Amino acid sequence: MTDVDIKIENIVASATLGKSIDLQTVAEALENVDFNREQFPGLVYKLKEPKTAALIFGSGKLVCTGAKSIEDSKRAIKLTVDMMRTMDPDIPEEFEIKIQNIVASANLGKPLNLEAVALGLENTEYEPEQFPGLVYRLDDPKVVLLLFGSGKVVCTGAKSAEDAKLGVEKTKARLAELDLI
């Protein structure tokens, strides 16, 4: 299979603490927090290192976004929970962190004729009047690729970096098979 370099642009991960959280208390105790219940039901806690944002909800659910690696994503959630535990010692030590979405980019190295790609590949959507990219859905791995005429690609929906890379590599191989690249 054709080897392609991918760059992870964003990882979204979540955790459920199994306990409700008093957002007002958290907002008052932490720095770098945006909290306005009328605009958004949770609070946004911005970490400097790793540079991420944690969305904290009253239900005890956390969502971390902005990490460039799975390790940073997990570290950001753990740091956020540790910070919250200083205010509420009943927050559990053990909780599961789930990777929800990985967004990665790649360059196929050659321009693409998106009209020809739309005709050649199945499971595509291409409406240039609406969006300049072609949407290509794969079943294995279950990812969505946005292909652009420049040859640049954005992969979304991956649960691992390996799935993102595999999705891009399979797509490049299929395009080569059809003489579209």
From Swiss-Prot:
Superkingdom per UniProt: Archaea
Ranges of the Sequence repeats in the UniProt entry: 8-84, 99-175
Sample GO molecular function, one term: DNA binding
Keywords: DNA-binding, Repeat, Transcription, Transcription regulation
SUPFAM superfamilies in the cross-refs: TATA-box binding protein-like (SSF55945)
Stored PROSITE patterns: TFIID (PS00351)
GO biological process terms, semicolon-separated: DNA-templated transcription initiation
Family to which this protein belongs: Belongs to the TBP family.
Record's function text: General factor that plays a role in the activation of archaeal genes transcribed by RNA polymerase. Binds specifically to the TATA box promoter element which lies close to the position of transcription initiation.
Alphabetized HAMAP family for the sequence: TATA_bind_prot_arch (MF_00408)
Protein name (Swiss-Prot/TrEMBL): TATA-box-binding protein
Organism of this sequence: Methanothermobacter thermautotrophicus (strain ATCC 29096 / DSM 1053 / JCM 10044 / NBRC 100330 / Delta H) (Methanobacterium thermoautotrophicum)
